[in-house]
Amino acid sequence: MAFYIPDKTIPNFSKQKSQHQFVLSPKFILSLQKISNILMNKTYRHEDKLKAVTSVLASKTSLGTMCHLCRGGESLPAQSSIQEIIDLCRAVLFPGFYGNDDVNIYNLEYFIGINCGRLHKVLSEQIAAGMVLGNDCDTTDYAALERDAATTAAQFIEMLPEMRRVLHTDVHATYCGDPAAVSTEEVIFCYPGLKAIINYRIAHALLTLGVPIIPRMISEIAHSETGIDIHPGATIGEHFSIDHGTGVVIGATAIIGNNVKLYQGVTLGAKSFDYDEDNNPIKGIPRHPIIGDNVVIYSNTSVLGRIHIGNNAVIGGNIWVTDDVADNEKLTQAKADNILRLKQD
């Protein structure tokens, strides 16, 4: 339904133009103009203030390093595109569970091919955007940068078969380690720990290829989605599982062996930073724990510093661990002796 505003040359304002149009009276039109003028005057009344604030916000003094300017119009990495990369990787790694839900034996290769093609395109664009961000747009040959990005994206896609094999061990470990899990299908569909591990393995592979910024964006999307924070720089073996998962933190230089299981709230972190002569934290040094094979760490335990947790060790919940743990050792919290039990009448 539309409104017809009559031309000033038409004397009869009650004239209908069609069955579905209504005439606005001159009095109503005048009221609209008055409202518009009032709103415009309120804006103009503060125009000087807005201009002054805009000048301050755009000044180099205010911006400092909080602004990224592209001289050639190159785009920066986009959150929506990074999410699409994750979705495409999941669809390729777990066809039918993610992405197209009508995959069958006859169209499986077709759907994987379509998703791989789309993945290469989007990933190439985002890798190039990440390189631009890292170079602060100083590159003079953007076409060469795009070619390098396309090559890197192809190298990543070549890593997907091995990544799927490793993820299969993670799914199996998660299923076998949780008596509440009904099937591996349930693990793939539902478990936040596995989703975080998938994102980690994608991000870690990209990081090993030298891709800037994108790996961290992928891991932080998993952090937001699951509450599990795994830095893409961590090294994690096969048959890895995270049960429940909320609050798990794995630092950038952590090394985790095979068949390791973490429960919710576990932190594999650093004790403190070393500082240089200017009192700035020294980055890039190993500062997180090394976890051996077949280790279980229960909920809300913090393992801090570059310490070694031996093979087959079991660490109980709510413990602060800052020293090495030997092979086959079990750490538990001392039994509380200050519990008051009240008898009910």
Predicted regions and their residues:
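Terminal amphipathic alpha-helical/low-complexity segments used for targeting or macromolecular assembly
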Residues: A2-F13, L24-M217
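Short coil/turn motifs at helix boundaries and re-entrant loops, enriched in small/polar
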Residues: Q16
